[in-house]
A protein has these predicted regions:
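Nucleotidyltransferase catalytic core that binds NTPs
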Residues: 1-186
């Protein structure tokens, strides 16, 4: 079985993420997609919404979009490094302990993300030991060239801060979780 690992904050999940999952599953690039939400991105100073709430938003958005449980999973790996950070390298290594040895993992990342991975904690080792599939982002070319998604989680958060409704860029269920918990209003 080949599992695609979709890295990101998913703060919040949006239609771009859902389109990526649909594309890689429909094209047979992977058999299942595993969301690996960042516990806390060391590059971002803004504190993310709790990882549990983000997992609820992911689960809700995926079900609302017609995906079944056997097509995706959400893994919250909070393996903290000795310096107190949660690095992608450590999270990915933890997955090897959780899943069967015969699973083939593929990192699904935006072209900009994959390009910057070498700068990450143990990034060269990560790129050497993990296969990647690049997904196009505006201004970049990639293996999946027709996936240029112009929506971003930060744009959605900005809409919410300005009391705008971010539909149709998020699912209705995601919107309800955001409203119920008064998220992104700061």
């Amino acid at each position: 079985m080949k599992i695609g690992i979709l890295l990101g904050s998913f703060d919040p999940i949006h239609i771009g993420h859902i389109a990526i999952v649909s594309k890689v599953l429909n094209e047979g690039l992977v058999d299942k997609v595993l969301f690996l939400p960042a516990v806390q991105n060391p590059w971002k100073h803004r504190k993310a919404v709790s990882v549990d709430l983000r997992a609820d938003m992911i689960r809700t958005a995926m079900y609302e979009s017609g995906f079944e449980m056997n097509q995706f999973n959400i893994e919250i790996v909070s393996r903290q490094n000795k310096d107190g950070n949660y690095y992608t390298f450590d999270q990915l290594e933890a997955l090897k302990d959780i899943y069967d040895k015969d699973i083939e993992f593929v990192i699904l990342g935006g072209t900009d993300t994959v390009k910057d991975m070498s700068k990450w904690y143990r990034g060269e080792e990560l790129l050497k030991n993990w296969k990647t599939v690049e997904i196009s982002r505006p201004g970049f070319s990639s293996e999946i060239s027709d996936m240029s998604i112009t929506v971003s989680s930060s744009a959605i958060r900005n809409l919410l801060r300005n009391n705008k409704i971010p539909l149709p860029w998020i699912t209705r269920g995601t919107w309800e979780i955001i409203e119920e918990n008064r998220l992104y209003r700061d």
